[in-house]
Amino acid sequence: MTSHRSQSKATVQVRPPPSFIEGVQDKSWTPTPENWLYGSWYMTHTSQQYYWERTKNFVIQYAPVMNGVWPCTNQELVSLTPLSQPERIYTAFGIDSPVAGLDDAWLCQCTGHLSHISDHVAFLAWGADSKNVDWVVLYSTPLPGATVGLPAQVAIMSRERFGPDNSMVEAIKEAFCAAGDSDLTKLVDNLRPLLQEDLESGRPTCEYHVVQNVDSLTRF
C-alpha cells in the first residue's frame, strides 16, 4: 500500500516511546490514518541483534479482529526464516489490544503455546519515502517485570520488501538522534539491515496451528 503520502525527509516527525502504563499521549504526535496499518509490512532494519544475526524475510501482517469503533483490536502474524534453516518459515501469532489514552500503541498478547509472552508495541514515526512507499518505525518492549522475551527494539518496516530508500533511512535515524532521548538513541544507533529476499511463495495464513503457535519462531 503506497496511497498515503506523508512526511518528507525534512519533516520526519518522531516521538519517544510512550508511557504505556500511564497512557499519556504526546500532544505533538500525528496518528496514523484509520486502517493504515493493515496488510503486510517488511522489516528492513532492526536494532534487535538476535534478528539481524540469525533471521531473514521478517514480515508482520496486521488485520482487524472485527469491524468496530476505531481503534480496533488487531491480529498480528509474524513470519521469518532462520538463516540456518533457509527452507523453513516460522511464525508467531498474537492479539494487539489498543492501549487506553494512546494512539498507535498496543498490548500484544501471544496465543497458544506462546501465551506467556506479551509486549507493548508502538509506532514512533511514519511516512512515505521519495517513491511514495509507506514506512513506519516500530518500537517493542517487554512488560515490566517480564522474565521471557527479547529486549526492547526499534525497527523500520516498509510496504516494499527492500524498504525505504537510503536517504529516508538516514533521515529517520537523524530525526531520532535529534530528539535527545538517550535510551532511544542507543537503539537507533544499533539499527542494522535485515535481509529480505524476492520470494515467489505466499505468506503464512492464520490457520489453527499458526494461531496456537505450534510451530513458533521461538523454537528454532
Sequence positions of predicted segments:
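A beta-rich soluble binding module of mature secreted/lumenal proteins
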Residues: M1-F220
